[in-house]
Amino acid sequence: MNVSFSTPVQNSTASRLALIQQAAARSGALPPAGQYRGSKLSPFDVSQMSGVSISMVERAKINGPEFVEELEWLRQQTTSRCFLDAEMWTNEILAHLPDKWCAPNTLNLYNQVSELVLDNTRSPMASPASNSLYAPGEDQMPTVKRNHTSRFAQSLIKNKEFRRAAFFLEKTMNGNKLDHFLHFRCLFLAYYQEHLENDAEGIERKTSFAEERSPFSLLYQRMEDKKLRENEDVWFEYLMGLLEVELGLKDLAEKSFRNVVIREPRIWPAWEALSRLIADIEDADKFVTSAEVKSLWMGDWFMTLVLQRFHQHSMAIQKAEQLVTRGMTGLPMIITKIAACSNARHDHDQAISNFEDVRKADPYRLGDLHLLSDSLYIRNDQKKLSTLAIEVYKVHKFRWETCCIVANYHAIRRDSEHAIKFFQRALRLNPGLAALWVLIGHEFMEMKNNAAACVSYRRAIEIDPADHRGWYGLGQMYDIMKMPAYALFYYQEAQKCKPHDSRLLVALGDIYSKLNRIEDAEKCFTGAYLFGDVEGNALWSLAKLHERYSDDNKAAQAFEVFLVVYELVTSAEEKIIYAIAFLANHFFKIEDFDKASEYATKCLAFETLCQEGNRLFREIAKIQARESRLPVEEAPGPSNASAAGGQEAMDTEEAPQEGGEEEMSEGEDDFSF
């Protein structure tokens, strides 16, 4: 039977046991979550399971000197243009270079080629005659004073005094190409900062411009009038792409960032911005592999971010590990990304292990560390979480990651009021993060404040409709409130965002079963198992569904596969005990005494089932003894007639004893079938 893995559920004429067994075989080929390194799972298998197709071509080892040259160029560009985040990102990679790439001749390679020149911008579109430092026909400020003013403006940018910096750069912009760019960038940063400050208290509350146009719109029009998109400095087009994002012109912004990457593939901020806008994974892969893009390694890292954004975390891990295989070993950036993807896949042990490796190399690094607190919270490791919260609170008290970690610490102690307080503080520091609203919603649910939880989840959906967690939170809330029709809608929306998440399919199946839509529920539970049952609930829910509607044969089939998969999992002991008891009694009822004896034997391995197992053995022995006497009773002869009366009397005497044993066994355990 051929099975399509591009959709979570399907109709099939084959038996349900065959479908489940095929799912077990398919899932059995997968390694444990987060353990792809050294496994036999091919990129094609991962692609088939995820429903998307990208190129996983084996690429050659990264050339160390070329890698360093790219980063040195980017470091100089981001430093001179005051892109502080990109500068720190670049310097972190350079600081963790593999030892073999740190030879003196390698590190000095680029510095021997050129020194930093303020107006130098490498671009294939630049003309040799266009590198004049001064704009034609403009008055020139004395060189010394201009240099001092430029340096002062750059200091103001680093101090986040953007309007003040723009004021001073306006004096020097006509005599210096770099200051020309920085002036427009400072205006953008000033408007962006004011926008965030206005929206800090209420995300998505739009500022009203009743009498004047948006400052972003005015700045964009000014740059269009000056034809800065065609400027030899490619960074102008990148800046216009950022303006287009703020104006809601997402298609134009995507086109701008694509052009920037084609013109200068070493500008990582353009790759990063494009990863947040590109429409789908296949389109991103086609762009990266096109002949126009000449990238040594940034294209692969870009694909890792795109795959993570579209919730293809297994494939993102593989892409990241490809970079490690190609030589980028020991980089906290890559290890942290693998940890973040493991967290999203609910492989929290792997995530914790990876984060701990990063903290050994860089103890004060906060990037994505809130996800470590999330994994510790889910693992209920209060000791490690409290230690982490104390350490980061001492050093980085006013970072949003710290606020999330401290909030999770209060949450694990069931102090929801303090948890909400710190989550709200994190929102003020990073107002555009939908995940924070989701976490606040969870805490309101703990406090049984459904109205506030509903508002929080809806805020998360407004900020990022593609994030399944806001939809899933609303579905859970309505499910708890016994409103399954509402819950169904939000679970369906969540499943659209992340169609291969087994948790969402199990939740959908539960709602369908509550609405008596049995076939839909069965498809969801089966589909959840097909896509790798993360929490181990799909087969169990499928078996209980059939048991609830008295379809014991199908329930037994599901319980059998459940035991094959989970019998050795200690955390599922209660479910294992129930499944064994059900199967032992089921096969006894249908008189399959061989299988009944097999499961009765398994009953003896559990203290709570010993008496049930012994009772079944006695019942089976009596039935088999009775059946063995039947041929003797039916044989012709005078002795049989005389023995019939005596045998009948013996059966009459034994009957109360059997009934007594049944009465004794009744109530010996908590299982009822």
Swiss-Prot record:
<feature type="repeat" description="TPR 5">
    <location>
        <begin position="400"/>
        <end position="433"/>
    </location>
</feature>
<feature type="repeat" description="TPR 4">
    <location>
        <begin position="332"/>
        <end position="365"/>
    </location>
</feature>
<feature type="repeat" description="TPR 6">
    <location>
        <begin position="434"/>
        <end position="467"/>
    </location>
</feature>
<feature type="compositionally biased region" description="Low complexity">
    <location>
        <begin position="635"/>
        <end position="646"/>
    </location>
</feature>
<keyword id="KW-0813">Transport</keyword>
<dbReference type="Pfam" id="PF13181">
    <property type="entry name" value="TPR_8"/>
</dbReference>
<feature type="repeat" description="TPR 2">
    <location>
        <begin position="159"/>
        <end position="195"/>
    </location>
</feature>
<feature type="compositionally biased region" description="Acidic residues">
    <location>
        <begin position="650"/>
        <end position="673"/>
    </location>
</feature>
<dbReference type="GO" id="GO:0045842">
    <property type="term" value="P:positive regulation of mitotic metaphase/anaphase transition"/>
</dbReference>
<dbReference type="GO" id="GO:0006836">
    <property type="term" value="P:neurotransmitter transport"/>
</dbReference>
<dbReference type="GO" id="GO:0031145">
    <property type="term" value="P:anaphase-promoting complex-dependent catabolic process"/>
</dbReference>
<comment type="function">
    <text>Probable component of the anaphase promoting complex/cyclosome (APC/C), a cell cycle-regulated E3 ubiquitin ligase that controls progression through mitosis and the G1 phase of the cell cycle. The APC/C complex acts by mediating ubiquitination and subsequent degradation of target proteins. Developmental role in early embryogenesis and the metaphase to anaphase transition in oocyte and spermatocyte meiosis and mitosis in germ cells. Required for embryonic anterior-posterior axis formation.</text>
</comment>
<dbReference type="InterPro" id="IPR007192">
    <property type="entry name" value="APC8"/>
</dbReference>
<feature type="repeat" description="TPR 1">
    <location>
        <begin position="86"/>
        <end position="120"/>
    </location>
</feature>
<comment type="pathway">
    <text>Protein modification; protein ubiquitination.</text>
</comment>
<protein>
    <recommendedName>
        <fullName>Cell division cycle protein 23 homolog</fullName>
    </recommendedName>
</protein>
<feature type="repeat" description="TPR 10">
    <location>
        <begin position="577"/>
        <end position="610"/>
    </location>
</feature>
<dbReference type="GO" id="GO:1905188">
    <property type="term" value="P:positive regulation of metaphase/anaphase transition of meiosis I"/>
</dbReference>
<feature type="repeat" description="TPR 3">
    <location>
        <begin position="232"/>
        <end position="267"/>
    </location>
</feature>
<dbReference type="Pfam" id="PF04049">
    <property type="entry name" value="ANAPC8"/>
</dbReference>
<dbReference type="GO" id="GO:0060090">
    <property type="term" value="F:molecular adaptor activity"/>
</dbReference>
<feature type="repeat" description="TPR 9">
    <location>
        <begin position="539"/>
        <end position="572"/>
    </location>
</feature>
<dbReference type="GO" id="GO:0009949">
    <property type="term" value="P:polarity specification of anterior/posterior axis"/>
</dbReference>
<feature type="repeat" description="TPR 8">
    <location>
        <begin position="502"/>
        <end position="535"/>
    </location>
</feature>
<comment type="subunit">
    <text>The APC/C complex is probably composed of at least 12 subunits: apc-2, apc-10, apc-11, cdc-26, emb-1, emb-27, emb-30, mat-1, mat-2, mat-3, such-1 and gfi-3.</text>
</comment>
<dbReference type="GO" id="GO:0008356">
    <property type="term" value="P:asymmetric cell division"/>
</dbReference>
<dbReference type="InterPro" id="IPR019734">
    <property type="entry name" value="TPR_rpt"/>
</dbReference>
<keyword id="KW-0677">Repeat</keyword>
<keyword id="KW-0802">TPR repeat</keyword>
<dbReference type="GO" id="GO:0005680">
    <property type="term" value="C:anaphase-promoting complex"/>
</dbReference>
<feature type="region of interest" description="Disordered">
    <location>
        <begin position="628"/>
        <end position="673"/>
    </location>
</feature>
<dbReference type="InterPro" id="IPR011990">
    <property type="entry name" value="TPR-like_helical_dom_sf"/>
</dbReference>
<dbReference type="GO" id="GO:0016567">
    <property type="term" value="P:protein ubiquitination"/>
</dbReference>
<dbReference type="GO" id="GO:0051321">
    <property type="term" value="P:meiotic cell cycle"/>
</dbReference>
<keyword id="KW-0131">Cell cycle</keyword>
<keyword id="KW-0217">Developmental protein</keyword>
<keyword id="KW-0469">Meiosis</keyword>
<keyword id="KW-0498">Mitosis</keyword>
<keyword id="KW-0132">Cell division</keyword>
<keyword id="KW-0833">Ubl conjugation pathway</keyword>
<keyword id="KW-0532">Neurotransmitter transport</keyword>
<feature type="repeat" description="TPR 7">
    <location>
        <begin position="469"/>
        <end position="501"/>
    </location>
</feature>
